[in-house]
Curated annotation (Swiss-Prot):
Ca(2+) 3 binds at residues 26, 56, 139. This is Capsid protein. It comes from Satellite tobacco necrosis virus 1. Self-assembles to form an icosahedral capsid of 17 nm in diameter. Keywords: Calcium, Capsid protein, Metal-binding, RNA-binding, Virion.
């Protein structure tokens, strides 16, 4: 009986210490703005998390791992000469080893209406965080945007700099694809994180 009480006291003390440490963690911020991009009918993949490089600044990391507390993606599509569709897929690469995924690793075909690639979906390589379609019309709303807020997760890195080779498991990406080349799209990504 005394041993059980002692174990409970130790557990309660450990939880209290952990809570105290977590309340004093330094929250850092990273922002990435990407504007004036032409709609890509074959798709393009943008790396969102590898800009968090090693260093001592408020937008850098200490080691090879960060814990994202929350992150936000803001996307906007603008129809120029014809009505068009923009598709934005925000995803996490669970098995990344220093590369930027290709469009065909995420989608079955390079088409804005395509389903996800069944092989990588079956292997659970990617976690789709959000899949958003913006239909912009010249006779209606020619500019549309969407803001997506999500809780975070762990991101690992294989290096210190902002290159594809530094990507590790948990890296965050956005795929953009559309039905016409004449539209423009913008995105901004913000992550609030702590060193893990």
């Amino acid at each position: 009986m005394a041993k059980q009480q002692n174990n409970r006291r130790k557990s309660a003390t450990m939880r209290a210490v952990k809570r105290m440490i977590n309340t004093h963690l330094e929250h850092k911020r990273f922002a990435l703005i990407n504007s004036g991009n032409t709609n890509a009918t074959a798709g393009t993949v943008q790396n969102l998390s590898n800009g968090i490089i090693q260093g001592d600044d408020i937008n850098q990391r200490s080691g090879d791992q960060v814990r994202i507390v929350s992150h936000k993606l803001h996307v906007r599509g603008t129809a120029i000469t014809v009505s068009q569709t923009f598709r934005f897929i925000w995803f996490r690469d669970n098995m990344n080893r220093g590369t930027t995924p290709t469009v065909l690793e995420v989608l079955n075909t390079a088409n804005f209406m395509s389903q996800y690639n069944p092989i990588t979906l079956q292997q659970k390589r990617f976690t789709i965080l959000k899949d958003v379609t913006l239909n912009c019309s010249l006779t209606g709303e020619s500019i549309k945007d969407r803001i997506i807020n999500l809780p975070g997760q762990l991101v690992n890195y294989n290096g210190a700099t902002a290159v594809a080779a530094s990507n590790g498991p948990g890296a965050i990406f956005m795929l953009q694809i559309g039905d016409s080349l004449v539209g423009l799209w913008d995105s901004s990504y913000e992550a609030v994180y702590t060193d893990a």
